[in-house]
């Protein structure tokens, strides 16, 4: 992987990630394909929304279908017929989400399979091996996602163990002679000094990119912004910056304003299946009866297949009838909305008009622009 940085506007960055399987324009949003599919979408449909790269879930793909079946197909690209770049998370967040059915030790994590209750062990080495089998273009280190809230002492212990796991991840990645890229993950909860210590340790180990983890886990939005404003300027400028698991459209805008290059989130797809549709004027809840006889498109500013061909009334009808097509059309729209937002942000950075773009984004939704800390 090669990262090129073209231009900046304030702290925002316009560039690209160059892989053998294709180029990813940044800032970029990655749709989430947890089980090797963006729910309800074919790879061609996902690509048509403007997506350059997908995220796959190491933990879930390890449990089902497993490494053996993946290797029989070649790798995840061949298994799901997506021949463009794929980033896989390490499984750390999913293990964190298991709650009481997992036990974290220095060696790794013991847990019971949420599928059949089988006892399973996952550690940094195994995570690297699974991601190698998946053929991930971007591999994430195995870390512990610090819960929120956490005391500073709890956050410190978690972060320091994640640093030790980062070194083990790096060593195993190198032992496997994996030709792809490995990203470190900055932890430290809402404590700036711990974030500093985490980043310093990761840079000493050396990675191809740096992710900000442990945010969007319940902390106030102000804390997320504060941590990003503190951490981003310290990340090596020649490396991509990835904000994990984020987020709402306004979170993408605010992340870009603070120097983030990459995002992922299930929100556009999950919300689509629940009838919450993102538009240039805010969220439309298509299940609301007001849309029953509305012949207008979801968003006249959107160029997606759904908006060009169907009315709000039709989408309301499909949802009321529990038709699969409704969830698919909603997903196409939400994914395209996210990609159009990223296209707009990239264009604004290129032309030095990011402030105007951000103001218009919030004004069109009747909201105030959040302030940046100098």
Curated annotation (Swiss-Prot):
Coiled-coil stretches: none
Positions contributing to substrate binding: 89-93, 143, 187, 214
GO BP of this protein: queuosine biosynthetic process; tRNA wobble guanine modification; tRNA-guanine transglycosylation
Cellular component annotations (GO), alphabetically ordered: cytosol
Protein name: Queuine tRNA-ribosyltransferase
Chain spans, region RNA binding: 245-251, 269-273
Gene3D superfamilies given in the database record: Queuine tRNA-ribosyltransferase-like (3.20.20.105)
UniProt-listed PANTHER family: QUEUINE TRNA-RIBOSYLTRANSFERASE
Active-site residues per Swiss-Prot or TrEMBL entry: 89, 264
Family classification: Belongs to the queuine tRNA-ribosyltransferase family.
Broad enzyme group: transferase
Record carries keyword Transferase: yes
Assembly behavior: Homodimer. Within each dimer, one monomer is responsible for RNA recognition and catalysis, while the other monomer binds to the replacement base PreQ1.
Pfam families linked: TGT (PF01702)
Cofactor comment: Binds 1 zinc ion per subunit.
UniProt-annotated binding residues for Zn(2+): 302, 304, 307, 333
MF GO annotations: metal ion binding; tRNA-guanosine(34) queuine transglycosylase activity
Alphabetical UniProt keywords: Glycosyltransferase, Metal-binding, Queuosine biosynthesis, Transferase, tRNA processing, Zinc
Catalyzed reaction equations: 7-aminomethyl-7-carbaguanine + guanosine(34) in tRNA = 7-aminomethyl-7-carbaguanosine(34) in tRNA + guanine
Record EC number: 2.4.2.29
Superkingdom of the organism of origin: Bacteria
